[in-house]
Amino acid sequence: AGDAAVGEKIAKAKCTACHDLNKGGPIKVGPPLFGVFGRTTGTFAGYSYSPGYTVMGQKGHTWDDNALKAYLLDPKGYVQAKSGDPKANSKMIFRLEKDDDVANVIAYLHTMK
């Protein structure tokens, strides 16, 4: 299990360029991350998703620990695999390199309910 306090520092340093972390926060380059766990992929109201995310949601994909871990390590590859579209793209070009960083960010995201 990750360390939420460390994850918060990573999220604020790395994720906030494109995502808001606050409840009711605005849409930025990406959708807000508050309450992401259990959210059906591609469904945040008002955000214009790439088609791969919409297809994932239509297939019933939701964000959980395993999904976020794989996604944060390789966003584009994950969307391609889960959407079934080898040409699917993602605006999220950033990725986390270390498993510990991923675990810590996931632990932090769990605190945002």
Swiss-Prot record:
GO terms for molecular function: electron transfer activity; heme binding; metal ion binding. Binds 1 heme c group covalently per subunit. GO terms for biological process: photosynthesis. SUPFAM superfamilies: Cytochrome c (SSF46626). Keywords: Electron transport, Heme, Iron, Metal-binding, Photosynthesis, Transport. InterPro entries: Cyt_c-like_dom, Cyt_c-like_dom_sf, Cyt_c_1A/1B. It comes from the Bacteria. Heme c binds at C15, C18, H19, M92. Coiled coil: none annotated. PROSITE patterns: CYTC. Cytochrome c2 is found mainly in purple, non-sulfur, photosynthetic bacteria where it functions as the electron donor to the oxidized bacteriochlorophyll in the photophosphorylation pathway. However, it may also have a role in the respiratory chain and is found in some non-photosynthetic bacteria. Belongs to the cytochrome c family. PANTHER family: CYTOCHROME C (PTHR11961). This is Cytochrome c2.
